[in-house]
Amino acid sequence: MKRINVLHFGAGNIGRGVILPIYQQNDFSIDLVELNQNTVNELQKQKQYQVHYLDCDQSQLVNDFNTWNLKDEAKIIELMERADVISTSIGAKNLASLKTLFDKAKFHKRAIVLCFENGFRISSNFKNILQLNNTQVNFVDVVIDTIAPNFEKKANFLDIYCEKYSEIYAETFPLEIKGVNQKNSLDRFIIKKLLLVNALHSVIGLLGFQQKLKYVHETLQVKSNLTFVEKLAQQIIDALCAEYPEFNKNNLLSYGKNNLVRFANPKIQDLNTRLIREPLRKLNQNERFYAIYKLFKKNKIALNNILQVYLMVLKTNITDDTESQQIAKLINEKAWTELAKLSSLEESEWNLIKQELSREITKK
């Protein structure tokens, strides 16, 4: 039987730790594309690596793949043209860099595109970026929920440390992939994951960073932090149930509680700084914090906690994060009109944030 050809862009934690193990489990023919030459060299040399699971005493050997450098354009286009599945885990903001390859590739058969990225309907957004005329390419939206941190203590450069726990949902497409659950509609799964995983995770990172705590699990060991996150989670669940009657409240409560247990796992050693980068993206209207704000506003849920989160986002100053530095510069320049636009908050709520930021400047 002919093997399914898959081409995956991105040899980072999600690519190596989650996506390739799934493809290997399905006995797919795997081609992995990566831009970092050092990573490519090591993968081509060692031809295997281990995935170590941090929520159980298990590991998995991944050794059935070929590796290519993204700069090898002719070869990548050849692989794209014969692929049954093309997938990504390179970061949503980097997808536009693949446009040239997609423009040059001639798709003579049906190809499925799966973007395993954080965010709202990223595959659909990618389709809009590419504007392909070829109807052979089927863009399928995906939701992926697993924690794959930048683990510091590694015996082997290539090895990945992540959760074995993984939930992946995709809208229905004409290929069965073990490990990927297909649904007719993803809306509920997207919003549930965006708010009760991505948003809460980021909030913990913000709290920890402000308190000069290094890891997520350390942050949750502070009682006041756990209390704040639990209250926000309860508000989110109330809002989701009000907005989507098909949600079961007890199931959401269990889901939220389980996520906090996952985040509190000390073996994961998840850096708070990993979770709070790219603050401008996180304030986008298609992103986590605005989604919560909009839901709370519509369903008349108190805004004090989510506004506190907005304030933390704007005050977080990470020296090596471009977006964070951009916000810090605007605050120092008192560029309130531009900051108000970036926040997307309504005037009454923005004025509360502005007052707090002004106080911070005065203190300096």
Curated annotation (Swiss-Prot):
Sample GO molecular function, one term: mannitol-1-phosphate 5-dehydrogenase activity
Oxidoreductase is among the record's keywords: yes
EC number: 1.1.1.17
GO terms under cellular component: cytosol
Record field: transmembrane: none
Pfam families tied to this protein: Mannitol_dh, Mannitol_dh_C
InterPro entries xrefs: 6-PGluconate_DH-like_C_sf (IPR008927), 6PGD_dom2 (IPR013328), Mannitol_1_phos_5_DH (IPR023028), Mannitol_DH_C (IPR013118), Mannitol_DH_N (IPR013131), NAD(P)-bd_dom_sf (IPR036291)
GO process annotations (BP): mannitol catabolic process
Family, as annotated: Belongs to the mannitol dehydrogenase family.
HAMAP family tied to this protein: Mannitol_dehydrog
Protein name: Mannitol-1-phosphate 5-dehydrogenase
Gene label: mtlD
